[in-house]
Design a protein with these regions (language model features):
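Short amphipathic alpha-helix that is part of the acyltransferase structural core
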Residues: 1-28, 145
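Small/polar loops that bind or transfer phosphate-bearing groups
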Residues: 5, 66, 106-107
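Active-site rim helix/loop that mediates acceptor-substrate recognition in acyltransferases
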Residues: 18-40, 45
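Conserved beta-strand in the GNAT
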Residues: 42, 48-57, 61-64, 69
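Active-site beta-strand termini and strand-to-loop segments that position acidic
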Residues: 44-46, 135-137
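Conserved acetyl-CoA pyrophosphate-binding loop and the N-cap/start of the following alpha-helix
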Residues: 74, 78-86
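Conserved active-site alpha-helix within GNAT-family acetyltransferase domains
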Residues: 93-134
Length: 145
């Protein structure tokens, strides 16, 4: 198994992204997202892309996992764990000594067990609220009277 950083192109991203059931409407949207990504990690087995993770963040206090996918037939083989490890090592390599930073994500229901096994904690707790998100759609064909 090999992991490469910052080698992901839109076509590979789309292949992996859709392999886990996610939908993207526009290749141009993916290209822009990749251009503005802090770091990209791609896992290969026998020169075949089998997993990826994209990292967003400010490089100082907060990092965010987005687009974490492993092709279903390769799940359960340690690829996700390897990618999480690579992400953590990358973050440690760019932050100053003694800094603490947050690594955050929104999990699917099916992914909660995996993330807990890899050291993540659920946000919903006594002293903090749940993680939240909102989808925003630009509707250019909207006619208003």
């Amino acid at each position: 198994m090999k992991v490469f950083i910052n080698t992901l192109i839109a076509d590979l991203f789309l292949k992996l992204y859709t392999s886990v059931g996610w939908i993207v409407s526009y290749k141009e949207q993916v290209e822009r997202a990749l251009e503005n990504t802090l770091a990209l990690f791609m896992a290969y087995e026998d020169d075949k892309p089998v997993g990826m993770v994209r990292i967003l963040g400010d490089s100082g206090m907060s990092f965010y996992i987005k687009g974490f996918a492993v092709i279903p037939k390769y799940q359960g083989k340690g690829i996700g764990k390897l990618l999480i490890s690579e992400v953590q090592n990358y973050i440690l390599s760019i932050i100053d000594k003694d800094w603490s930073v947050s690594l955050e994500l929104i999990s699917t229901k099916e992914g909660v067990k995996f993330y807990k096994k890899n050291g993540f904690e659920e946000r919903l707790c006594e002293w903090d609220g749940p993680g939240m998100f909102k989808m925003i759609k630009n509707i250019s064909n909207l006619i208003s009277d």
